[in-house]
Amino acid sequence: MIDYKELISAAIESLKKAHKNQPKDLTYGSAVLTKKGNIYSACNYWSYTASLTLHAEQAALAHAAAHGETEIIAIACVGTEDNKKEQFCHPCGMCKQLIYESSIDSKIDIEVIMANLKGEHISKKISELVSHPWPA
C-alpha cells in the first residue's frame, strides 16, 4: 500500500494558493501521483462567472499532462468547505468524470484520496465512485 502523506501535503499546500471566490471564500487543492512517481499539484481558480471556474482536480490533471504524464495512479483532494464540517473532500461529479476518463485512457483504476486539512483521509478507486460512467 502506498503512503499518501506527501500527496495530501502537496494538495494542502496548493489549497493555500487558490484563487478565492467571493463571498464564500471556498478553496480547494489537489495533487496527482503519476506512474513515474512524480507529484503535480494545483488549486482551484475561481471565475466571477462561476461557469469558468477551474477545479483543483482538473488543474492537477492538466498540470501532469503539461509535463507529458498522463498515467495517474492517485489523486488527492482537499477543501476548506469540507473542513469546516470536519469532513473529507469529495470530487464533484464533473471532476469524477474527468478522473474516470483519465483512468480509461491509461487503463489504471485511479485511487481517489479524499482528505481533510489534518491529513486524515479515506480512499476509493474511481471505478467505485462513478456508478454510471459515460461513456459506459
Predicted ranges, named:
Residues 2-21, 70-136:
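C-terminal binding/interaction regions
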Residues 27-35:
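Short beta-strand scaffold segments in enzyme catalytic cores
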Residues 38-39, 121:
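Hydrophobic "anchor" residues
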